[in-house]
Amino acid sequence: MERALMDKLVEWKNSPRRKPLILNGARQVGKTWLLKEFGRRHFANVAYINLDQNTAMQEQFELGYDIQRLVSAFQFETGEVIKEQETLVILDEIQECPKALTSLKYFCEEAPGLAVAAAGSLLGITIHSGTGYPVGKVNALDLYPMSFREFLAATGNAGMSELVASNDPAMINSFAGKITPLLRQYYYVGGMPEAAAAFLERGLLEDARSIQNQILSDYERDVSKHLSRTEAEYAIAAWRSIPSHLGKENKKFVFGHIAQGARARNYQSGITWLEQAGLVTKVRRISKPGLPLCPYADDAAFKLFLLDVGLLGAMVRLDKSTVIGGSAIFEEFKGALTEQYVCQQLVSECGFTPYYWSAENSSGEIDFLAQGDNQVYAIEVKAEENLRSKSLRAFKQKHPWVSAVRFSMSGFREQDWMRNVPLYAIPSKALWGPEGEQ
C-alpha cells in the first residue's frame, strides 16, 4: 500500500536540518510498516528495535546517553552494521521506554548524521505523564488511517486517486458513476491498513469486518491496560457511547447520554486519554468564525468522532448490504457515517483541525468549520443529493467573509454564495473556494 506520508519521510531524509523523527499515531494505523518500507526503499539497511517488553534494550537506555555505546547495543540487538547516512534506525513503541524518548535529544546533538526514527502509539499520554520530551531536538509527523485517496490507490484505482484531487470538476463529475461505489466501499472497509489488506486479499467485505472487530477489542484492552479500573470503565463507556451520540440530530456529546446521572467530571479524563491516544477526534464548538478559529473554541461543547469510518460501522454492526446498497431504515445513521468520513478526511487528507458552530438560541448549526491559510470554510455535509442548505445560507449571510462549502453525493456546482463539492472530491481543495484558486 502506498501511504501519502512516504513523500514527507523522503523530505525528512534529505533535509539538511534533519533531526531524529517521531512518527505519532494511534495503534494499528501502519506506523511500523511505513517506517520499515521507507527504510527498505531509501536506505542501505534498517536496524529495527521494538522497545515493548524489551528488557535488554530498556536497560541500555537506563544506563545513560552515551551515543557510541547505544549504537553498539543497537548493532548487537539487530545484527546490522549501523552507518551514518546509510542506515535507518527504527525505535518502535518508544512510549514504553521514557529514557529512549529522552535519548533523541542526544542523537540530535551528537550524531546528526544518523537517521533515527521513533514510532509511538500513546506518545501524547506518555509526555503528559511526566516524561521529558526533547523539545526542539526532534521532527514529528502524524500518521492516520488511510484516506479515501490512499484507499483508491490500494484497491488498484490509482487514476481515480489522482482524479479526486485534481482541479477538474468536469472530469470529476463525468466519472461519478465509477467513484461513488468505491466511496461506499470505503465507508464499510475504512482506512485501517490491516482491514483494507484483508479485504483486498480475497475481495470479501466480511474479512475487513473481522479485523475491525479485533481492532476494537484491542483498543478496549489498551484502555484497561493503561488506566485504573475505574478510569477505564468511564473511558470505555464514553467510547462506546460515541455512535449513539453521532446518530442523534444534535451530535453534541452529552455526558447524561452515557448513563443516567452521568457527570462530566467522571468522564473527562477518560475522553482526554482517548483523544491523546489518537482514538477520537474532538471537534469543539466555536462562538464565531474569526481568524484564527482556536481562540473562539468552547472546550465544554464538543462532538466526538472515531479515528476511522470503518470502525464506526463495525461498532454499530452495520451490514455490508446496508452501507453499499443503501436502505430506507439506514437514512438517519447514514448522516452520522458521512460526517465521520468528512471529519476523517479533513484531518488526514487536508491537515485541518475541524470545529463546528451552533446557534445559542435556535436550531441552526454548521457541521464543520476549518481554517485555511487566510480563509474560514463553513462546511455542510449531506449524505446523498439533498441540496437544501438553510443553515449554511443563513450563516453565510451573517458572516459573508467565510467560504461556504457543501459536501454531498451531487456533482460539483458553483452558486453565487456557495460551492457544492462531491464527497469523494474533498482532497481537491481548489474546488472549495477562493483560497484554493489563489
Regions found by a protein language model. Give the residues of each.
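Hydrophobic positions on the alpha1 helix immediately C-terminal to the Walker A/P-loop
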Residues: L34, F38
